[in-house]
Regions:
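Conserved acidic
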Residues: 1-195
């Protein structure tokens, strides 16, 4: 039930100002920035409210994409980032224990607890004390792709251009496929908390 890339529904009509954004290697960059990997997970804010709302939307005959329309993150993450003292969250820790905390307490634990932590939009708490395997691999692939792009640029107009361009494209596909592999139940790297 993870959301994919956000694509807004078009708004019909003439508009004076429009804009678009395309972030370079968005998903690989997010994985690297949050140090997302199974070995870096500290805890998971249980998505009780979010999953209940998703179930309601699906029961009404709508698709999961309609639930996520206009939303950036799960309800629990939003409460944490808003430092809601009246909202209770359950955090499932990587050691198998659980804690009840207010959303504000979760925020303070992550951002003011004196530990190198980060929280993702789905409420997963990651440590960045040491680089994760997957973020490290993506960093290497990204650097390799930049090298291949430079070689393709140098070879523009020669017989070698297609060779280097296709090689950099393979790296791009590897980079962009990593997020999908992490959230594909058939993948050996599957972990719902990463999505």
């Amino acid at each position: 039930q993870a959301a994919g890339a956000y694509v807004a529904f078009p708004k019909k009509g003439m508009h004076d100002w429009i804009g678009a954004i395309d972030i370079n290697s968005l998903y690989p960059s997010a994985i690297r920035a949050l140090n997302m990997g199974p070995e870096t997970i500290v805890g998971q804010v249980r998505q009780t409210r979010t999953l209940a709302s998703i179930d309601e939307v699906i029961a009404s005959g709508k698709g999961i994409a309609e639930f996520w329309e206009g939303k950036f993150a799960c309800f629990e993450y939003e409460s944490v980032m808003n430092r809601d003292i009246g909202q209770t969250e359950i955090v499932d820790w990587s050691d198998g224990t659980s804690s009840e905390m207010s959303s504000a307490e979760v925020y303070n634990f992550v951002f003011h607890g004196g530990q190198p932590l980060m929280i993702s939009g789905n409420g997963t708490i990651f440590s960045y004390a040491s680089k994760g395997v997957i973020p490290g691999l993506l960093e290497r692939w990204y650097a390799e792709r930049k090298e291949l792009q430079a070689k393709a640029k140098e070879a523009y107009g020669t017989d070698m251009f297609d060779f280097w361009d296709k090689r950099q494209l393979v790296k791009k596909i590897n980079l962009n496929s990593a997020y999908g592999a992490l959230l594909n139940a058939g993948s050996r790297f599957f972990d719902q908390r990463l999505g």
